């Protein structure tokens, strides 16, 4: 196993640094997967907020639609992938595309798949126990498979001098055992630990991947610490020099980038990076998943798309999005 990248007293990592290779090749050449797929035959898809770029990039590449990364003017907090015809006329309708390709968030995407409102999803996590129960209750079996590597990272305000926490310190902050930054080498000030809403992919990963059964702080009586959107931790940390939050690595490095300046902390002295995610030296590595109903016809475009993303061509597209494809 490769030696982990270490961080000892160096400045924190802004999300911008890991995004440079993505922004440097903003537009793709027109290319398809070899399929003869018309847009009107394209399946209904859904996704998490953080997996939207990979879902969209695969769709554009298969359909032969050129694309570019650009700031999402609606949110103002992320970059997204959009069609790029560079002023030329095209029959492709972005409005029609958005109607067939939803972005309902992790829990919403699984709900739509269970309720047959969509045909295939790419989500930031595996199906949860509650979602699995909902599927079982209506006699639906969901097939899920990890498609790419991600991680849960911890972010702080750039003015916060803390640059590294141990896994144990993170857990103690979120159980309420550690309450002051001076206990972890910072200034003498109370820590504000921000959390996410219950059904979010980030919260589920925090509880299972990081806390591993430990009881987290309860936001019931502190609603101000609960973030309801993917951008919430960033907006909270931007305004709070003494806060800490968590977010997917890809969302931070590929989507937020420089729009909101935060520092990613190293954990156990390992910097979150593509290298440390690939070699699994960063402690909180996770996966994103593709999911489909078991009853989906093998002749359907949805089923063929599900199979395609696990091929070499599919993996190349996932890598192009900035994610790290899981390759057999």
Which positions does each model-derived feature cover?
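Sec-dependent bacterial lipoprotein signal peptides
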Residues: 2-23
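Exported/periplasmic ABC-transporter solute-binding proteins
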Residues: 25-328
């Amino acid at each position: 196993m490769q030696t982990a990248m270490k961080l000892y007293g160096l400045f924190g990592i802004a999300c911008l640094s890991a995004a440079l290779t993505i922004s440097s090749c903003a537009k793709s050449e027109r290319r398809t997967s070899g399929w003869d797929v018309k847009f009107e035959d394209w399946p209904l898809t859904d996704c998490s907020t953080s997996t939207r770029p990979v879902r969209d990039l695969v769709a554009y590449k298969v359909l032969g639609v050129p694309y570019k990364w650009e700031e999402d003017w609606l949110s103002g907090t992320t970059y997204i992938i959009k069609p790029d015809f560079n002023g030329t006329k095209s029959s492709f309708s972005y409005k029609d595309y958005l109607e067939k390709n939803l972005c309902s968030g992790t829990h919403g995407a699984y709900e739509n798949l269970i309720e047959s409102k969509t045909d295939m999803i790419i989500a930031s996590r595996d199906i949860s126990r509650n979602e699995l129960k909902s599927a079982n209750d209506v006699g639906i079996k969901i097939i899920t498979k990890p498609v790419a590597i991600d991680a849960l990272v911890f972010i702080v305000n750039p003015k916060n001098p803390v640059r590294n926490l141990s896994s144990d310190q993170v857990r103690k902050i979120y159980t309420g055992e550690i309450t002051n930054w001076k206990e972890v080498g910072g200034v003498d000030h109370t820590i504000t630990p921000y959390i996410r809403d219950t059904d979010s992919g980030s919260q589920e990963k925090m509880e299972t991947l990081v806390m591993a059964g430990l009881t987290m702080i309860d936001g019931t009586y502190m609603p101000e610490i609960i973030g309801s959107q993917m951008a919430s931790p960033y907006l909270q940390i931007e305004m709070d020099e003494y806060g800490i939050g968590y977010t997917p690595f890809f969302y931070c490095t590929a989507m937020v980038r420089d729009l909101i300046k935060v520092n990613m902390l190293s954990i156990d002295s390992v910097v979150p990076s593509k290298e440390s995610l690939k070699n699994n030296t960063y402690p909180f590595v996770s996966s994103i998943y593709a999911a489909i109903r078991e009853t989906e016809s093998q002749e359907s475009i949805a089923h063929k798309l599900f199979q395609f993303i696990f091929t070499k061509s599919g993996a190349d597209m996932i890598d192009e999005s900035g994610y790290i494809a899981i390759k057999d």
